[in-house]
A protein has these predicted regions:
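A short acidic (Asp/Glu
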Residues: 25-28, 52-57, 83-84, 126-130, ...
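Active-site-proximal specificity loops/subdomain of glycosyltransferases
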Residues: 12-13, 50-114
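Short beta-strand-to-loop acidic/aromatic patch adjacent to the donor-nucleotide binding site
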Residues: 44, 104, 111-125
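Catalytic-site signature of metal-activated, phosphate-bearing donor transferases
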Residues: 1, 126-254
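Short, hydrophobic/aromatic alpha-helical segments in well-folded domains
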Residues: 28-32, 100-103, 119, 131-132
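N-proximal low-complexity "stem/linker" segments adjacent to membrane-targeting elements
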Residues: 1-27
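An acidic- and aromatic-residue-enriched active-site/binding cleft used to recognize and process polar
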Residues: 19, 38-39, 47-50, 75-78, ...
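Short, acidic, metal-binding catalytic loop of nucleotide-sugar glycosyltransferases
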Residues: 31-40
Length: 254
C-alpha cells in the first residue's frame, strides 16, 4: 500500500472509524475541528457502510474548504467481538480498531504536526481556546489525554449543534472514556511497538502522557446510530446547558 506521510507532513490530522453515520454528522465533525483547532487533514476509515459509498464520504470531506487532504480507506471487515471472559480487557479482540489506527499512524500520520482521536459523536475543545494540537505539541512527552462530558439527546436534531445540554449532576454527566492527541515527531512514536487505539496509545514511552486541565471533549448521545447502546433515549435526570459548548457553537457560522 502507498505511504502518504510525506503528503501530510505538517498537517493537523483528525481521524476515526465510521459505519453508517449521517453525512451531515461527518461534515459537522470535520468542520468543527477545522474551525476550532485548525484541522486540515481527515482520515476516516469506513467499516462497511451500507447507506452510501466511501466516495460519498470523501466528497463530503472535500467540500470543506479548510480540509486540504482527505482520505476514506475502505475496511469492510468484522469490527471484532467483545470477550466477557476477559474482565480486565473484554475489547482485546477488536482487531480492526487497533489495526486501522496503526495504519493511520504509519501510512498517513508520522510526519503530521499532530493527530487527534475523536469519534463522529465527539467534539474536542479547550477551556482557553487554544488548539488541541498545540497542547500536544507543547506537552512534555507529546501525548495528551483528556476526558469529556455527555451531551444529552434532548430532542430531534440534525447536527451536533442542536444539542447543548448535559445532566445537572456532574458525576452523571462525566464521559469517562479517554481521548487523546499526539505529537508524532517524538522519538518514541517511531517504535513499531507503539499502537494507537480509541482510548489509549499502547507501548507509549514512560512519562510521555500528560492530562492538561485545559483539554476536554463533548460526547453527543444524539449523534448516534445506537450500534453499541441505546444512547438516543431521553435524559435520565434534570439537564442544564453546557455554557462553554453553547458559546463555542455560537461562534461558528450557521
Amino acid at each position: 500500500q502507498p505511504n502518504s506521510c510525506r503528503d501530510l507532513a505538517g498537517r493537523k490530522l483528525l481521524f476515526s472509524i465510521n459505519k453508517n453515520n449521517d453525512l451531515a454528522w461527518i461534515r459537522e465533525w470535520a468542520e468543527f475541528h477545522a474551525k476550532i483547532h485548525g484541522t486540515d487533514a481527515v482520515i476516516l476509515v469506513d467499516n462497511g457502510s451500507t447507506r452510501y459509498e466511501p466516495a460519498e464520504i470523501l466528497a463530503t470531506l472535500q467540500a470543506i474548504p479548510a480540509i486540504a487532504h482527505a482520505a476514506v480507506p475502505s475496511w469492510p471487515y468484522s469490527f471484532g467481538p467483545i470477550d466477557p471472559a476477559v474482565r480486565k480487557d473484554p475489547y482485546w479482540a477488536r482487531f480492526l480498531q487497533i489495526g486501522s489506527m496503526s495504519m493511520i499512524l504509519r501510512r498517513y500520520g508520522e510526519l503530521c504536526y499532530g493527530l487527534l482521536d475523536t469519534d463522529i459523536d465527539e467534539l474536542a475543545g479547550t477551556h482557553s481556546g487554544r488548539s488541541i494540537y498545540d497542547l500536544a505539541h507543547d506537552s512534555k512527552g507529546g501525548l495528551i489525554v483528556f476526558r469529556g462530558t455527555w451531551i444529552e439527546a434532548t430532542g430531534p436534531g440534525a447536527r451536533h449543534r442542536d444539542f447543548t445540554h448535559k445532566l445537572a449532576d456532574p458525576k452523571a454527566a462525566l464521559s469517562p472514556q479517554r481521548k487523546w492527541a499526539l505529537d508524532p515527531s517524538r522519538p518514541w512514536v517511531r517504535r513499531l511497538s507503539v499502537h494507537p487505539y480509541w482510548h489509549w496509545v499502547q507501548g507509549r514511552a514512560l512519562f510521555s502522557k500528560s492530562m492538561p486541565e485545559d483539554a476536554l471533549y463533548w460526547h453527543f448521545k444524539g449523534i448516534n446510530t445506537n450500534w453499541k447502546a441505546q444512547r438516543t433515549a431521553a435524559p435520565a435526570g434534570p439537564v442544564v446547558e453546557d455554557a462553554r459548548l453553547a458559546k463555542t457553537f455560537a461562534g461558528l457560522a450557521p
